[in-house]
């Protein structure tokens, strides 16, 4: 078992290379997809409905694929207009909060114009702000809708309904009241409120002034036209999402929902969860989401659907409450909510507690190893609020983890030091029993027992580092708090790769390397590679030539592989390697074991000089 420790280390290292290589070469950045052409007008009287009766959008009169109102049949079809022109088609009430700005159209009363004040498309504050929701008629409609469905109730509010507003502004502490009378005995009143972050509260009241009872079903939905460009690369979920009572978390990608059976029509596929209590449904991106939240103590039907209309796919998540029967002169009130904004961890958790929303924290994809990723984020967030820099927080958390695992690591390094001390005896045993593997292994075991050496103890530092590495990678990738979080110098976004590149000599040459160049190697990946190289040179080279070559190339492989990883992860790896080198150096000196670093470096340069001389 003389090579057991080395073999296991190689196996673990190669396994890590395979895992990282899989991400880099297989599930890395996908090729750019063109966004689907969108449609503009939807869900009006007579529009298609899903199996639960909720309106399903369909391009009709007023859409880009139909003649505009007042034109003759056969007139040229109109394409999507600019977002500004689409917003101008309806009178609107302005939304203005510390976190959001936008508007609600009085035609349809959809929440279809929301932008985020505090988030920009790039690191620069001069770049455009993030646009979350957009109206029909624009290139990428994405909106939330609330209403009622039912039979024999006369006209009900739809996408063409013109509501009356009691004001011209929706702001925190300043709710908006909308009213509409269907002319057949039903009066609808909607009060929309918004907090200082990302939560809308929609209170729908309907009064029956007719002489007949009426049965209605309240609903809310989030609809998105066209498949967006996703960024998850299998690391996190993007698409339709929700918590449906006892069925728990449901995640459907844009492709998956289209593979479900027909739902309410041949052009619509989807799945429904009936008679569930507690939960929410929505559509999530990497950092942003829109979610409809029904009353948590009442049963509802939740649904995920995809409707195909020509080249357009319309994705929709919806909830429909149980029937409400209104006797003459009776009224009913339903309160629903809409989350539309950034997936800030603390804000999501606060909403879950404040409104009792079932498992709302699952809006953030912590992954299967949430028991590692959540504590990792908590630690980083805690130190960020103390220090004001997530990069420094990463360094400090790494140091604390090193101290926490110090006893295990010390035992490992002490065992490794003892292995170095008995290296001559191990070499002698291999020579003595080179033709008898059984006796060689027995002699090695006796030596280990005599010297109290654990041959696989050296693997523990690597085993400990692997889960920490992936937990930090997940946190850097999924949490918006890490987005555009600066470190020092040229690192202005810990969640993005090091922006420097060896292609232009790290900025010395006056050009920006094109994105299609496969080599992405910045300063920090090179620093990480150097620290890994030094760590390898702390130990004598393995006697097996194959293993020696693997160890020699590992720093190079990891340097190029981590070049496209988030800078925060590369900084962590470089810092962890540095701490490991210091720790191993101190332990080896304490145990009287020679540190091989300088001899290995001198030997490497001597071999290089000899090779150059021989060629000369």
UniProtKB/Swiss-Prot annotation:
Residues 36-51, 64-80 have a biased composition (Low complexity). One of its GO terms (cellular component) is plasma membrane. GO terms for biological process: protein insertion into membrane; protein transport. It is a multi-pass membrane protein. Keywords: Cell inner membrane, Cell membrane, Chaperone, Membrane, Protein transport, Transmembrane, Transmembrane helix, Transport. Residues 35-83 are annotated as: Disordered. InterPro entries: Membr_insert_YidC (IPR019998), Membr_insert_YidC_N (IPR028053), YidC/ALB3/OXA1/COX18 (IPR001708), YidC/Oxa/ALB_C (IPR028055), YidC_ALB_C (IPR047196), YidC_periplasmic_sf (IPR038221). Disulfide bonds: none annotated. GO terms for molecular function: membrane insertase activity. It is found in: Cell inner membrane. Interacts with the Sec translocase complex via SecD. Specifically interacts with transmembrane segments of nascent integral membrane proteins during membrane integration. Belongs to the OXA1/ALB3/YidC family. Type 1 subfamily. This is Membrane protein insertase YidC. The gene is yidC.
């Amino acid at each position: 078992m003389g090579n057991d420790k080395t073999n296991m280390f190689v196996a673990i290292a190669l396994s890590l290379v395979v895992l990282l290589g899989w991400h880099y070469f297989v599930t890395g950045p996908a090729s750019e997809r063109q966004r689907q052409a969108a449609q503009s007008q939807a869900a009006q009287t007579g529009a298609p409905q899903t199996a639960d009766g909720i309106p399903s959008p369909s391009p009709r009169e007023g859409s880009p694929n139909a003649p505009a109102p007042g034109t003759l049949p056969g007139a040229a079809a109109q394409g999507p207009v600019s977002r500004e022109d689409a917003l101008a088609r309806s009178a609107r009430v302005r939304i203005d909060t510390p976190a959001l700005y936008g508007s609600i159209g009085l035609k349809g009363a959809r929440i279809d114009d929301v932008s985020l004040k505090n988030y920009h498309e790039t690191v620069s504050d001069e770049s455009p702000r993030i646009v979350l929701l957009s109206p029909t008629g624009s290139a990428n409609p994405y909106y939330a809708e609330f209403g009622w469905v039912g039979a024999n109730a006369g006209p009900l509010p739809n996408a063409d309904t013109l509501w009356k507003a009691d004001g011209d502004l929706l702001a925190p502490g300043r709710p908006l009241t909308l009213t509409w009378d269907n002319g057949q005995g039903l009066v609808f009143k909607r009060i929309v409120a918004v907090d200082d972050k990302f939560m809308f509260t929609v209170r729908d009241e309907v009064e029956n002034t007719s002489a007949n009872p009426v049965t209605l079903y309240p609903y809310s939905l989030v609809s998105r036209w066209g498949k967006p460009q996703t960024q998850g690369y299998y690391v996190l979920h993007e698409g339709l999402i929700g918590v449906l009572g006892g069925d728990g978390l449901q995640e459907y990608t844009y492709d998956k929902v289209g593979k479900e059976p027909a739902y309410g029509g041949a052009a619509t596929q989807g799945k429904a969860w009936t008679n569930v209590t507690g939960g929410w449904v929505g559509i999530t991106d990497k950092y942003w989401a829109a979610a409809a939240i029904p009353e948590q103590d009442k049963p509802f039907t939740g649904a995920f659907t995809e409707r195909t209309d020509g080249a357009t796919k319309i994705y929709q998540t919806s909830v429909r409450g149980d029937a409400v029967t209104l006797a003459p002169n009776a009224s009913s009130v339903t309160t629903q909510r809409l989350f539309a904004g950034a997936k800030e961890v603390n804000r999501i958790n606060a909403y879950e507690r404040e409104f009792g929303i079932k498992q709302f924290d699952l809006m953030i994809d912590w992954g299967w190893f949430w028991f590692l990723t959540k504590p990792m984020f908590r630690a980083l967030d805690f130190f960020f609020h103390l220090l004001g820099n997530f990069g420094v927080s990463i360094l400090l958390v790494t140091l604390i983890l090193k101290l926490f695992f110090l006893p295990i690591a010390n035992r490992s390094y002490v065992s490794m030091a003892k292995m170095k001390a008995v290296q001559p005896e191990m070499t002698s045993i291999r020579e003595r029993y080179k033709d008898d593997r059984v006796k060689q292994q027995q002699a090695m075991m006796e030596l280990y027992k005599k010297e109290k050496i654990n041959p696989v103890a050296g693997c523990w530092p690597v085993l400990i580092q692997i889960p920490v590495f992936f937990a930090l990678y997940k946190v850097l990738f999924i949490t918006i708090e890490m987005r555009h979080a600066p470190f020092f110098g040229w690192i202005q976004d810990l969640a993005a790769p090091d922006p420097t590149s060896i292609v232009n000599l790290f900025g010395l040459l006056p050009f920006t390397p094109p994105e299609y160049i496969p080599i992405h190697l910045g300063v920090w990946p090179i620093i990480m590679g150097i620290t890994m190289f030094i760590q390898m040179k702390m130990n004598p080279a393995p006697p097996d030539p194959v293993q020696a070559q693997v160890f020699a190339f590992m720093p190079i492989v990891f340097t190029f592989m981590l070049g496209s990883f988030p800078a925060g992860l590369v900084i962590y790896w470089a810092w962890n390697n540095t701490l490991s080198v210091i720790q191993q150096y101190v332990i080896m000196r304490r145990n009287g074991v020679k540190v091989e670093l300088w001899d290995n470096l001198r030997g490497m340069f001597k071999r290089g000089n000899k090779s150059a001389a021989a060629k000369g």
